[in-house]
C-alpha cells in the first residue's frame, strides 16, 4: 500500500495531537522538581546564566539584588512560573504594573539576553521560570552568599496575574502580623521562611519614596518611626530630604551594601532596618517568634545561609507549573505564538524524556 506525502503528514499530526491529548488527560502535572532536570538536555545552563550575570555586574553592581527580587516577586504570584516577565497583551495586564513592581522591578533586559544565550545552546528546552530560579541562586552566590543546587522542572505560565500580584506582594509598610499573613497565604507558614527570606535585603537598594513616612510622618503622627535608630534617622534624612527626589536610591544594608551576608540582621538589632517591614521582625510587639531568629542569624552567618537556602527551596516549590502544564517560552516576555504546535511538541519531548 502506498501513502501520499499529505496523508503521512496528516497521520503524523493526528498521532502528535492524540499523544498530546492522552498526555494531558494522564496529567503529569505533579512531576517533582529535581536539581538534575537539565543534566542531559542542557548541562551548560547554569554556566550560561552565571556568565550572563557576571558580564552584567561589570556595568550594573545592583543587578544581583534585582534578579533575586524578580524571582521572589514571581514566586509570590501563582508560584514560580515566570509570569512576572510577561509584557502587556490584549488578553491580560502585565505584573510589571503591580504596585510592588511598577517603577521598581528591574533587570528585564538582562533576562532577555540570558534567555537568548540559553536558547542558542539548548533550543526549546529551559523554561524562563527555571532560568530565573537559577539566576536568583547564582546572584546570591556571586555576591558572597551560599551556593546550592536548585530544584528544577518548572514550566512557564500562559498569562500574567496583575490583580493577584497586587494582592500577594508584601508592601514595605507592612506590620509583622500583615507579613506573617502574607507569607502564610502562599504556603510559607514558618517564622524562618519570613525571617530568612527577608535577609535578601542584605544587598540591593530601595527608593526614598518607600521610607518617607518612616522619616517624617509615621502613622500620620508628624513624627519619625520610633523604632528607627536616631543616628540612622539623620543619615537617611540627609539622603532623602523632605522635599527631595523620592526616586533617589538608598542601600538596604548600610554596612556591606553589595555583599550577601548576615549584616542585615545585625542592622535590625541596632534598629537600623531601612524599611518598616524589615524592622518589624525585631521591634514589633508581635515579634516573639522572629526575634530569636534575627539574633541567631546575626550571630552566625552559616546559620543564616542554611535557613535561607531552605526557605528559597520552599518558596521555589510554591504550586509549581510542571509536566504538561504551561509551556517553555522562547521569549520570556511573550507567550509562544502557535502555542498549540509548541505545546504538542513539548509534550512529545516530555514523553520521550521519561
UniProtKB/Swiss-Prot annotation:
Triggers of expression: Transiently induced by ozone treatment. Up-regulated during a continuous drought stress. Early induced by benzothiadiazol, a chemical analog of salicylic acid. Enhanced expression following both compatible or incompatible pathogen attacks.
Q: List the active-site residues.
A: 73 (proton acceptor)
Q: Which residues bind heme b?
A: 201
Q: Which GO terms describe its molecular function?
A: heme binding; lactoperoxidase activity; metal ion binding; peroxidase activity
Annotated residues that bind Ca(2+) 1 are located at 74, 77, 79, 81, 83
- Tissue-specific expression: Expressed in roots.
Determine the domain of life of the protein's source: Eukaryota
Q: Which UniProt keywords apply?
A: Calcium, Disulfide bond, Glycoprotein, Heme, Hydrogen peroxide, Iron, Metal-binding, Oxidoreductase, Peroxidase, Pyrrolidone carboxylic acid, Secreted, Signal, Vacuole
Sites carrying sugar chains? 88, 217, 229, 245, 286
Extract the PROSITE patterns matched here: PEROXIDASE_1, PEROXIDASE_2, PEROXIDASE_4
Its primary localisation, in coarse terms, equals secreted
Cofactor note from UniProt? Answer: Binds 1 heme b (iron(II)-protoporphyrin IX) group per subunit.
Q: Which cofactor does it need?
A: heme b; Ca(2+)
Question: Matching InterPro entries, A to Z?
Answer: Haem_peroxidase, Haem_peroxidase_sf, Peroxidase_pln, Peroxidases_AS, Peroxidases_heam-ligand_BS, Secretory_peroxidase
Q: Which cysteines are joined by disulfide bonds?
A: 42-122, 75-80, 128-332, 208-240
EC numbers listed for it are 1.11.1.7
Subcellular location, in the record's words?
Secreted; Vacuole
List Pyrrolidone carboxylic acid occurrences by residue.
32
Annotated GO biological process: defense response; defense response to bacterium; defense response to fungus; hydrogen peroxide catabolic process; pattern recognition receptor signaling pathway; reactive oxygen species metabolic process; response to light stimulus; response to oxidative stress
> Which residues lie in coiled coils?
none
UniProt: substrate binding residues: 170
Annotated positions for site Transition state stabilizer: 69
Please explain the role this protein plays, according to its UniProt record: Removal of H(2)O(2), oxidation of toxic reductants, biosynthesis and degradation of lignin, suberization, auxin catabolism, response to environmental stresses such as wounding, pathogen attack and oxidative stress. These functions might be dependent on each isozyme/isoform in each plant tissue.
Q: Which family does it belong to?
A: Belongs to the peroxidase family. Classical plant (class III) peroxidase subfamily.
Q: What else is known?
A: There are 73 peroxidase genes in A.thaliana.
Name of this protein: Peroxidase 33
Question: What is the organism of origin for this protein?
Answer: Arabidopsis thaliana
Amino acid at each position: 500500500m502506498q501513502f501520499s506525502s499529505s496523508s503521512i503528514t496528516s497521520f503524523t499530526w493526528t498521532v502528535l495531537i492524540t499523544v498530546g491529548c492522552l498526555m494531558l488527560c494522564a496529567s503529569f502535572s505533579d512531576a517533582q522538581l529535581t536539581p538534575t532536570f537539565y543534566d542531559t538536555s542542557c548541562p551548560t545552563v547554569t554556566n550560561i546564566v552565571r556568565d550572563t550575570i557576571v558580564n552584567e555586574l561589570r556595568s550594573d553592581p545592583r543587578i544581583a539584588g534585582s534578579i533575586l527580587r524578580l524571582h521572589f516577586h514571581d514566586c509570590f504570584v501563582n508560584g514560580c512560573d515566570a509570569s512576572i516577565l510577561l509584557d502587556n497583551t490584549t488578553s491580560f495586564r502585565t505584573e510589571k504594573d503591580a504596585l510592588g513592581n511598577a517603577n521598581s522591578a528591574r533587570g528585564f533586559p538582562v533576562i532577555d539576553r540570558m534567555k537568548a544565550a540559553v536558547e542558542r545552546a539548548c533550543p526549546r528546552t529551559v523554561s524562563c521560570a527555571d532560568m530565573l530560579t537559577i539566576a536568583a541562586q547564582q546572584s546570591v552566590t556571586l555576591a558572597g552568599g551560599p551556593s546550592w543546587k536548585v530544584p528544577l522542572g518548572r514550566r512557564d505560565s500562559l498569562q500574567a496575574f496583575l490583580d493577584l500580584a497586587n494582592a500577594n506582594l508584601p508592601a514595605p509598610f507592612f506590620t509583622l502580623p500583615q507579613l506573617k499573613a502574607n507569607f502564610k497565604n502562599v504556603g510559607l507558614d514558618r517564622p524562618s521562611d519570613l525571617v530568612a527570606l527577608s535577609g535578601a535585603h542584605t544587598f540591593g537598594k530601595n527608593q526614598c519614596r518607600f521610607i518617607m513616612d518612616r522619616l517624617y510622618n509615621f502613622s500620620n503622627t508628624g513624627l519619625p518611626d520610633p523604632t528607627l535608630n536616631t543616628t540612622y534617622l539623620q543619615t537617611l534624612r540627609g539622603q532623602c530630604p523632605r522635599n527631595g527626589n523620592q526616586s533617589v536610591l538608598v542601600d538596604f544594608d548600610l554596612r556591606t551594601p553589595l555583599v550577601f551576608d548576615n549584616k542585615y540582621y545585625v542592622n535590625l538589632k541596632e534598629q537600623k532596618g531601612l524599611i518598616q517591614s524589615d524592622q518589624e521582625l525585631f521591634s514589633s510587639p508581635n515579634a516573639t517568634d522572629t526575634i530569636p531568629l534575627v539574633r541567631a542569624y546575626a550571630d552566625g552567618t552559616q546559620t543564616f545561609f542554611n535557613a535561607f537556602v531552605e526557605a528559597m527551596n520552599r518558596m521555589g516549590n510554591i504550586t509549581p507549573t510542571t509536566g504538561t502544564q504551561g509551556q517553555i517560552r522562547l521569549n520570556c516576555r511573550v507567550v509562544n505564538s502557535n502555542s498549540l504546535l509548541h505545546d504538542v511538541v513539548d509534550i512529545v519531548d516530555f514523553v520521550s524524556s521519561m
